[in-house]
């Protein structure tokens, strides 16, 4: 089994940071971009904030 599969198999829900569970579609665009640490002018992105 690959190392990544081993890591995924041992992953616990507590291992996720709260920031990873934020619903970016439910917040203002500028706040979502701030959390993601990117802007639509500097990355190729398919997120709803970049495609609307």
Curated annotation (Swiss-Prot):
One of its GO terms (biological process) is killing of cells of another organism. Its main location: secreted. GO terms for cellular component: extracellular region. The modification O-methylthreonine is found at residue 46. Has bacteriocidal activity against Gram-positive bacteria, but not against Gram-negative bacteria. Inhibits bacterial protein biosynthesis by acting on the elongation factor Tu (EF-Tu). Belongs to the thiocillin family. This is Thiocillin. It comes from Bacillus cereus (strain ATCC 14579 / DSM 31 / CCUG 7414 / JCM 2152 / NBRC 15305 / NCIMB 9373 / NCTC 2599 / NRRL B-3711).
